[in-house]
């Protein structure tokens, strides 16, 4: 079990997570997310999706700090694909 307690999400954060879960393992473009969640087309200056993905990641990371759930495909979009974070090695 990854989560031992609930994660308080806003309705928009929940809808974002739900949409990514529906397409689990597939990259969902920012434009698709903007259209499905906010009903509008992407503008190059519109950072709405990025802001909500960041907030959602922060909340999930607090519950499961050893995992990464939302992967970024730079220049394309996001996908929900849980992975273990790499261990950091400190050289003395």
Report the location of each language-model feature.
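Short, small-residue-biased leader/transition segments that mark boundaries at the very start
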Residues: 1-2
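Basic, Lys/Arg-enriched C-terminal extension of HTH/homeodomain DNA-binding domains
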Residues: 66-92
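Positively charged, aromatic-enriched patches within helix-turn-helix-type DNA-binding elements
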Residues: 6-76
